[in-house]
Amino acid sequence: MVKAVAVLRGDSKITGTVTFEQANESAPTTVSWNITGHDPNAERGMHIHQFGDNTNGCTSAGPHYNPFKKTHGAPTDEVRHVGDLGNIKTDAEGNAVGSVQDKLIKVIGAESILGRTIVVHAGTDDLGRGGNEESKKTGNAGPRPACGVIGIA
């Protein structure tokens, strides 16, 4: 079992951790999150971005991680970026706790997410169904108030 973690920080009150666990290269990856300080009772986009560079805040993380050159989509879509995790749901206090298994995200192997950045967005991900060009790239999920580089745990 290989485990990786990202500690979320940014220019907002949003903090938390996102962990990734994968047993072997062909196994799905379990993604778990515990995030506090976001908007209450909301759905907010969460994606893995290309670069592990946070020198200019979360904006320097670049676009969604997309090694197969697909368009943006929902985590359950056949056509999607590797980094497309959809939306997290927050409770009345703005906290989100959850987990999901994903077949495209890899901790182990050539398309590993290690050293890349996970970003929690300020808006809701439209899952590529927004009817415009930006939707097919970002899901119109908006600004990047918190992020963290994914590293071996």
Curated annotation (Swiss-Prot):
Residues 126-137 have a biased composition (Basic and acidic residues). Zn(2+) binds at residues 64, 72, 81, 84. Its cofactor is Cu cation; Zn(2+). One of its GO terms (molecular function) is copper ion binding. Binds 1 copper ion per subunit. It catalyses: 2 superoxide + 2 H(+) = H2O2 + O2. This is Superoxide dismutase [Cu-Zn]. It comes from Humicola lutea.
